[in-house]
Regions:
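Divalent-metal (Mg2+/Mn2+/Ca2+)-assisted nucleotide/phosphate chemistry catalytic cores
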Residues: 55-179, 186-188
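Flexible loop/turn segments at secondary-structure boundaries
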Residues: 9-10, 42-44, 92-94, 184-187, ...
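Active-site catalytic microenvironments for nucleophilic, acid-base chemistry
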Residues: 22-25, 29, 139, 165-170, ...
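Short, hydrophobic/aliphatic alpha-helical segments
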Residues: 1-4, 26, 33, 134-144, ...
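N-terminal catalytic cores of NTP/NDP-binding nucleotidyl/phosphoryl-transfer enzymes
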Residues: 1-47, 151-157, 163
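Buried hydrophobic packing segments
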Residues: 19-23, 136, 159-166, 224, ...
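Well-ordered mid-protein domain cores that form the structural environment of catalytic cofactors
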Residues: 24-71, 76-77
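Conserved nucleotide- and phosphate/pyrophosphate-binding catalytic cores
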Residues: 166-359
């Protein structure tokens, strides 16, 4: 059972766990689990689902990321039953002649049939030749480890099918492709990603994890229950209680039940002591906000235009951001330069007496 990961970032978020949890299930059924670390392919960058070329990473960055990535993966996987391999072990030994022979097995037409490449070409954007190597390299990984099954997100299907073709040419039985759904981020719009700021990291503090889960929209609950927990939401519970239970279960899974209990208690204490009743919050249309504002500019804009209070940037930094008075869905925002991910229903607290809800 192969699951390949490129450690382009040091942390795992809940979106990554969907495939990792599936690999764990196969471990429990007695199958050999192989976690393939793309220490070579990560320096190229997977173009799947990308509208632009990924920035390159150094090998040193990749290896540093791989160390924390695997450590966090073992919160889910059974360490003793997991084989870890690095694709740099074979790609760094290849001669240029061997690379050309490998490339000769795939046509340009096959590569340009990819939806993301096709969209870029039609949109007049660049597709670099090294990006076209990526599906071939991922496919060759399956040849090297003689994979029977490859797990991945739905965006990996093209790459996995290339692996099947290469295995056939090598006289192997082609691997089975098992794709997992891509998990929507907390904004409910784009897939969960650290670069979008809509993620929940598996190594985050329990309080932060619980608070982030509580910031998810009600519409995401059924999806999160099913994809992350493999169960259906109890429709007999009030939506708020169902969301608390979801947040508790996720926090307990990556920490423990005691930490989840404390995180829930802390969140409920803060929630119950809010100075403003939720129903009384002024509403602000997201579409009415100036584009590309960072947190500092947004808070300044809201103070002045919603509450008719003008504050200097220095005061906002010192009296609001630094002490953690700025909270998005009860999660403290201390970085004035951050770009906040706003969704309908999100509540931004500016101070004890000032808060808005977005629509």
């Amino acid at each position: 059972m192969k699951l390949g990961v490129d450690p382009t970032a040091p942390d795992i978020h809940l979106g990554h766990t969907v495939a990792i949890e599936k690999l764990r299930q196969f471990q429990e059924l007695g199958h050999q689990a192989v976690l393939l670390i793309g220490d070579f392919t990560a320096t190229i960058g997977d173009p799947s689902g990308r509208s632009v070329t990924r920035p390159p990473l150094s090998r040193e960055q990749v290896l540093e990321n791989a160390e924390t990535y695997t450590k966090q993966a073992f919160k889910i996987l059974d360490r003793d039953k997991t084989e870890i391999v690095y694709n740099g072990d074979w790609f760094r030994k290849m001669t240029y002649e061997e690379v050309l022979k490998l490339n000769s097995r795939v046509t340009m037409q096959q590569m340009l049939a990819r939806e993301d490449f096709k969209a870029r070409v039609e949109g007049g954007k660049e597709v670099r030749l090294h990006e076209m190597q990526y599906p071939i390299m991922q496919g060759w990984d399956s040849v090297e480890i003689r994979a029977d099954v490859e797990l991945g997100g739905t965006d990996q299907l093209f790459n996995i099918l290339v692996g099947r073709d290469l295995q056939k040419e090598e006289g192997m039985l082609p691997q089975i492709a098992m794709t997992m759904p891509l998990l929507e981020g907390l904004d409910g719009v784009r897939k969960m990603s650290k670069s979008y700021g809509n993620y929940v990291g598996v190594d985050e503090a329990p309080e932060m994890m619980f608070g982030k889960m509580m910031s998810a929209s009600d519409e995401l609950m059924d999806r999160y229950y099913l994809v992350l927990l493999g169960e259906k939401r109890d429709m007999g519970l009030h939506p708020m209680e169902a969301k608390k239970l979801l947040a508790w279960k996720i926090t307990a899974r990556y920490h423990d039940s005691a930490a989840a209990d404390t995180a829930r208690s802390d969140w409920e204490t803060r929630f119950s002591k809010r100075d403003l009743a939720a129903a009384d919050l002024p509403e602000v249309e997201i579409a009415s906000l100036p584009a590309d504002m960072n947190a500092l500019a947004l808070v300044s804009f809201l103070f002045e235009n919603v509450f008719q209070v003008k504050k200097s940037n220095g005061v906002l930094r010192k009296e609001h951001f630094t002490p953690g008075a700025i909270q998005l869905n009860d999660v403290k925002m201390t970085d004035p330069s951050a770009v906040l991910e706003l969704a309908p229903g999100s509540v931004l607290r500016l101070s004890k007496k000032h808060a808005v809800r977005f629509k």
